[in-house]
Design a protein with these regions (language model features):
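C-terminal catalytic domain of Rieske-type non-heme iron oxygenases
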Residues: 177, 205-210
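Extended ligand-binding clefts on enzyme/binding-domain cores
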Residues: 28, 32-39, 43-54, 65-76, ...
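Active-site lining segments of carbohydrate-active enzymes
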Residues: 1-9, 14-44, 53-58
Length: 210
């Protein structure tokens, strides 16, 4: 599972940001773990395109297509962090991070019937994609990870789609106007957490008082 593979890298960054415990970063078991993550990442990479595949979605449900936009954003961020921590590999890791970012915009951005761009949930690199979102790993969090700004039109269109009443798993217009998914077909608490982080904090805080 791609999101779980890179999660320790993001968790390590959170720990270092709070503690400034640089000695921990140099512990042998930490460095061995980071090396193992990089090795596993190489196994998941498409041979010709800088996208990484997964076999399960963030909910642990089966995928529709193997290349998830959200998961690859996590890979992009993890590669940036690893570049900061591994000076000898900095150039190659940053180059790969840039390649992943470019591949996401090339292959994971689609257009709706009006020609407006949005981030697909997943793609297969053969022309197929799906419009979807999951609270455990939401496309709403892309600005939170620094992948784009909240002013990014592609991201704004994406959020508008999945929060719209037209989207199958949206609870727009309901007392808790959040997002569900087949794994949990109701407004998840995780969706409230996403709203707190993605620019809908006022709404989420109001819903938490219901």
């Amino acid at each position: 599972e791609l999101d779980e593979l890179v999660a320790p890298v993001l968790a390590l960054q959170a720990y270092l940001s709070e503690t400034h415990d640089e000695a921990f970063l140099q512990e042998r078991f930490v460095q061995d773990g980071l090396s193992l993550i990089l090795a596993r990442l190489r196994e998941a990479r498409h041979p010709d395109t800088a996208l990484y595949e997964t076999f399960l979605q963030p909910t642990d449900d089966e995928i529709v297509h193997p290349y998830l936009t959200y998961d690859n954003v996590l890979v992009w961020r993890a590669l940036q962090l690893l570049a900061d921590w591994r000076p000898a590999q900095r150039g190659s890791l940053l180059a790969e991070a840039d390649a992943v970012r470019a591949a996401i915009f090339t292959h994971c951005v689609k257009k709706d019937a009006d020609g407006q761009p949005y981030f697909a949930w997943s793609v297969d690199l053969a022309g197929h994609h799906d419009v979807y979102d999951e609270p455990p790993g939401s496309l709403q969090l892309l600005p939170y990870y620094g992948f784009c700004e909240r002013t990014d039109v592609i991201w704004q269109n994406t959020v508008r789609m999945i929060r719209s009443a037209d989207y199958k798993f949206s609870f727009a217009g309901k007392p808790i106007a959040e997002i569900g998914c087949p794994h949990a077909p109701w407004p998840w608490v995780l969706s409230l957490c996403n709203s707190l982080l993605c620019g809908h904090a006022e709404q989420a805080l109001r819903e938490l008082t219901i």
